[in-house]
């Protein structure tokens, strides 16, 4: 029924509505509610603080009124900078899903000032999830760390892509493509066809997926769905469960790891970062910019190298639960025996 009611709402407006506390908006099929109480701790959440662009709280000694400024966003989650290059330039989801700026408290201005070139961004080429933002909320807060923004675990586009996947796996791949492309085109991305499939879904636009065979039309759809669910539901808590459901979590982590370790950033985008990843141009612009292209990832990421297939898809069951639940027969999840 939801699929028959295609919603044509700009993705920026859809996620602005969440931040503005517009409850059960057109995109939502189910929301987990938090108290819209200006960020008081009781029954509040962390959407747009943990997973939004960085925002400094007003200086406590400045006399700035909380009711005229944004609350703090701690920005504990960052985005790998190459991810934005996988989107088409015309895909409006790209600039909604992640941002490259912060709001710093500037004492002389007595205000939170938007900065796109600052140490916090440049030193690690930080990018932040952008679907939930303090700047989209009404000014004012009580507790700087909390918001009343609801979490939507099930929304329209997610269901359309679920239906598309089901059609493909039951032999109706043309209908699967129609539904997947309806999600793409409502965000102004190009519909995938046999003529443009390789240019949109294969290297060098994205990296290739050797663990998904795309020798037939159903396989091409699975490859497209791999990327499309990532583009559409980025940072919504869906990805791990998609990869587990498809049986490719380990493969996907290793493929991403290999790409990270061999990716060279473009001079135009990271001209203010030296070969060690340190900023050469700070907020005041006093230090001249010197750029030397290097491989961005210089450290091993645990998930990419240490993931064990058949084990790490699940967490271990705590011993106390095994001992107290006779139905478990003393058994733990695979790999934790």
Predicted regions and their residues:
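Acidic/polar-rich alpha-helix caps and helix-coil junctions
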Residues: 1-43, 89-337
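Acidic-aromatic pocket-rim loops
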Residues: 38-68, 78, 205, 236
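Alpha-helix initiation/capping motif
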Residues: 51-52, 79-80, 193, 318
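A short, charged
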Residues: 61-99, 127-130
